[in-house]
Amino acid sequence: MAAAAYVDHFAAECLVSMSSRAVVHEPREGPEPRPEGAAAAAPTLPRVDERRDGKDSASLFVVARILADLNQQAPAPAPAERREGAAARKARTPCRLPPAPPAPPPGPEPASPGQAGAPAAPPSPAWSEPEAALEQEPGPAGSGEPGLRQRGRRGRSRADLESPQRKHKCHYAGCEKVYGKSSHLKAHLRTHTGERPFACSWQECNKKFARSDELARHYRTHTGEKKFSCPICEKRFMRSDHLTKHARRHANFHPGMLQRRGGGSRTGSLSDYSRSDASSPTISPASSP
């Protein structure tokens, strides 16, 4: 900084000296009166002064031009100054927002309900909720009036998605079982309440059961009845699940063999050997074979 200030000061001195000496080169209007004693030396002195002044002014003029050219070239800014300048220009630059979308054209006016051949209603805008979207369906023939049906596209309840055959739900917390018959639901609810309404009527047997099929299986232990026979070896069993387990051990066994047999050798219903919550119709011990 000190060197630059010195150079500027020196250039200013040169320019001042050039401006002060410029009067010497201007022609004078008339000769000035000179003293009589200096008449002999007068012709030689002005020539020497003019030569010296010309050399000095020429050298000062060259130096001034060089310094002026140097001052016009600004020094390169430091990296930190460049970053600061870029940040300042970025801060001064106004933020440009994207252009706003054009407004939708106005739709046609809705026609009265009695007007025949009325144009369809314009589609709902993009920002409307899809749950409340209206779907058009053709009205009755000859009416000329479109029927509107409102249907939710997203939020559908679980009951709508379930099969209509399974509509009896368990109301206990944490239990999500659903049944197709109310009797099956009642039998399942006994697993929560602990109720056992089906008691064994055999002498000195006080066992009770929550389902009638369980009572029927138990009653066969008293009578010794074995109504389930194997279609291959004719071996008999009290329970159908015991028969199925035995029949699968045969090499030539096929599941259709148990389904074709009837009468006293039938396999029975699925509830006789399964642990499902479905309840079969009530069978009293007296009516069971």
From Swiss-Prot:
Record PTM Phosphoserine, positions in chain: 269, 271, 280, 284, 288
Record Pfam families: zf-C2H2 (PF00096)
Protein name: Krueppel-like factor 13
SUPFAM superfamilies: beta-beta-alpha zinc fingers
UniProt keyword list: Activator, DNA-binding, Metal-binding, Nucleus, Phosphoprotein, Repeat, Transcription, Transcription regulation, Zinc, Zinc-finger
Lineage: Eukaryota, Metazoa, Chordata, Craniata, Vertebrata
PTM note: Phosphorylated by PRP4K; phosphorylation regulates its transcriptional modulator activity.
Keyword Signal in record: no
Organism of provenance: Mus musculus
Function noted in UniProt: Transcription factor that activates expression from GC-rich minimal promoter regions, including genes in the cells of the erythroid lineage. Represses transcription by binding to the BTE site, a GC-rich DNA element, in competition with the activator SP1. It also represses transcription by interacting with the corepressor Sin3A and HDAC1. Activates RANTES and CCL5 expression in T-cells.
Domain of life (superkingdom): Eukaryota
Keyword NADP listed: no
Family: Belongs to the Sp1 C2H2-type zinc-finger protein family.
Molecular function, one GO term: DNA-binding transcription activator activity, RNA polymerase II-specific
Tissues and organs where the protein is expressed, per its UniProt entry: Ubiquitous.
Main location: nucleus
Biased composition regions of type Basic and acidic residues, renumbered to the chain: 23-35
GO biological process: negative regulation of cell population proliferation; negative regulation of erythrocyte differentiation; positive regulation of transcription by RNA polymerase II; regulation of transcription by RNA polymerase II; transcription by RNA polymerase II
Segment forming the signal sequence: none
Gene3D superfamilies in the record: Classic Zinc Finger
Ranges of Low complexity composition bias in the record: 267-289
